[in-house]
UniProtKB/Swiss-Prot annotation:
Keyword Cytoplasm (UniProt): yes
Any single GO BP term: methylation
Function recorded in the entry: Methylates ribosomal protein L11.
GO cellular component: cytoplasm
Gene3D superfamilies: Vaccinia Virus protein VP39 (3.40.50.150)
Subcellular location: Cytoplasm
Protein name per its UniProtKB record: Ribosomal protein L11 methyltransferase
Gene that produces this protein: prmA
Length: 292
């Protein structure tokens, strides 16, 4: 079978939105180029349905523009790829990468030996999801976990994606992790990566629109690395599922909306205890106020 590489040129703050569109129309994974000209690439079979797929992508991009969410330039390019090249391209694109002081993200096909005694590998299969653990927002979240986890905590990972934050939390000693994502396809993606990491075998993954379908006793930590507009909707949901004094770790927040998200956090009884920034992305550690 031959494949076509479909690339969408976009901008930094729209990467995850564009990636989600490509996944929704049938991609098994995406590649993100966020170094020079920003683009997101996905692979689709070169068959009679390809035209419909590209049309669906165009419509989704136009819809975002119509509702005021800019993904410009949003130009689409298509290039033919042979089956072998498509398979090899994933492996050529991803290699083991140190992402924080303690963590290295390792593709599942690479044999990797830690260079330091305190180094913690996270095994990921990047073919399955765009959250491979190397994007700035994910680095911010893993660093936040390194800062706050003491061991034995309970945690919810909202919008788990590849499951990378759930694995990192277990590596650091979090006792109980519940991970959520929007649908069964996303849940299966996370489960595949969790199976690659023995420490995360007991992580529970469920389909839920943010926390709407989560019924659980309040936890010590809630983490979320998702789109900023979704974070705004999530914040009020966290307050009933987080223990008083518990911590909410959040990223996926671009420069131009960071101050607004800070206001939303404060309006929902959070105190911001740490702000972090990597490039144009912001991350926060916020503490839920104790009840009087």
């Amino acid at each position: 079978m031959n494949w076509q590489a479909v690339s969408v040129a976009t901008k930094n703050e729209a990467i995850e939105t564009v990636a989600d569109i490509l996944l929704q129309v049938g991609a098994q994974g995406v590649q993100i180029n966020d170094h020079d000209a920003i683009s997101v690439t996905a692979y689709y079979p070169d068959d009679e349905q390809l035209g419909e797929t590209i049309t669906a992508i165009q419509k989704a991009l136009k819809h975002l523009s119509d509702i005021g969410m800019s993904v410009a330039p949003a130009t689409i390019t298509v290039n033919g790829i042979q089956q072998k090249d498509w398979e090899d391209n994933w492996k050529a694109y991803y290699h083991a990468e140190r992402v924080t002081r303690h963590f290295t993200v390792v593709p599942s096909w690479e044999t990797y030996h830690p260079n330091q005694i305190d180094e913690l590998p996270i095994i990921m299969d990047p073919k399955l999801a765009f959250g491979t653990g190397t994007h700035e927002t994910t680095r911010l979240m893993i660093q936040a976990l390194e800062n706050v986890v003491r061991g034995g905590e309970s945690m919810i990972d909202v919008g788990t994606g590849s499951g990378v934050l759930a694995v990192a939390a277990k590596q650091l000693g979090v006792a109980h992790v519940l991970a959520t994502d929007i649908d069964e396809m996303s849940v299966n993606v996370a489960k595949e990566n969790l199976r690659l990491n023995p420490v995360a075998q007991d992580v529970t993954v469920v389909a839920s629109d943010l926390l709407a379908d989560v019924v659980i006793s309040p936890v010590d930590l809630i983490v979320a690395n998702i789109l900023a507009d979704v974070i705004e909707r999530l914040i009020p949901q966290t307050t009933t599922l987080l223990k008083p004094g518990g911590l909410f770790l959040v990223s996926g927040i671009y420069d131009n909306i960071a101050l607004h998200i800070e206001d939303v956090l404060r309006a929902n009884d959070y105190t911001i205890v740490q702000k972090s920034q990597m490039g144009e992305w912001h991350g926060y550690i916020a503490q839920l106020k104790e009840k009087n």
